[in-house]
Amino acid sequence: MKILLILACAIACTCGERYCAMKDDTGLSCRNGTASDCESCFNRGDLIWLLANWNFSWSIILIIFITVLQYGRPQFSWFVYGIKMLIMWLLWPIVLALTIFNAYSEYQVSRYVMFGFSIAGAIVTFVLWIMYFVRSIQLYRRTKSWWSFNPETNAILCVSALGRSYVLPLEGVPTGVTLTLLSGNLYAEGFKIAGGMTIDNLPKYVMVALPSRTIVYTLVGKKLKASSATGWAYYVKSKAGDYSTEARTDNLSEQEKLLHMV
């Protein structure tokens, strides 16, 4: 995709016409009115013209973009995070529509090279969009959590306690999982996931769900203080397979719950 973008920019810059950086109020002539040597004119494509005339507007847009990308996390602001997710969800259909429209317009003027680039971009965008939906549905099938449709979510931590399943989106698969209990509140990866917990409610295993499999982490060590309901428990990888992460409330044993298939 980056290669296609670079090629498109190179073609736009080398095949452009003569543009004016400063225009008069009546037409498209240069500001000093000369046709040959105008210091306010340059020979470049549409891309350079846009940068020269809209550089301040683009800088404001990019500042907003940087702010959303850098601080679009739940621990900073849920509002900014929601804007970031909305942008990421809308990018696929917008880019797909733009590439299809550009392919049609290039075909109309018999610019078949750019038409080919536009078709290739549309195909790549559509394939990536379908892959996103496939992976999200696979992850939702395992966790029944709407975090599965977060474009940034590659894995979901699932903790079953008190007959409920608590989930936390992750960017990758951790080597080990640490659950921290502070005054009855359960934390994972620095986020509060449950309240009203005691040391007896800590699970014997936790799971990390991926689109292709579920990894089981077994409890290997803990240090708890019963009087203040404070402490920690550490889990390491023990097995992986097609396991469900849903909390079970029937009378199955721990091993039967673990082997419950999706």
Curated annotation (Swiss-Prot):
Spans within the Intravirion topological domain: 69-77, 134-262
Pfam family, one: CoV_M
Virion surface topological intervals: 18-47, 99-112
One GO cellular component, as annotated: virion membrane
GO molecular function: structural constituent of virion
Membrane topology: Multi-pass membrane protein
Main location: virion
Subcellular location field: Virion membrane; Host Golgi apparatus membrane
TM regions (residue ranges): 48-68, 78-98, 113-133
Segments of this protein annotated with the region Interaction with N protein: 237-252
CDD domains associated with the record: alphaCoV_M (cd21564)
Assigned keywords, A-Z: Glycoprotein, Host Golgi apparatus, Host membrane, Membrane, Transmembrane, Transmembrane helix, Viral envelope protein, Viral matrix protein, Virion
InterPro entries the record matches: ALPHA_CORONA_M, M_CoV
Domain of life (superkingdom): Viruses
Task of the protein: Component of the viral envelope that plays a central role in virus morphogenesis and assembly via its interactions with other viral proteins.
Subunit and partners: Homomultimer. Interacts with envelope E protein in the budding compartment of the host cell, which is located between endoplasmic reticulum and the Golgi complex. Forms a complex with HE and S proteins. Interacts with nucleocapsid N protein. This interaction probably participates in RNA packaging into the virus.
Family per similarity comment: Belongs to the alphacoronaviruses M protein family.
Name of the protein in its database record: Membrane protein
Source organism of the structure: Porcine respiratory coronavirus (strain RM4)
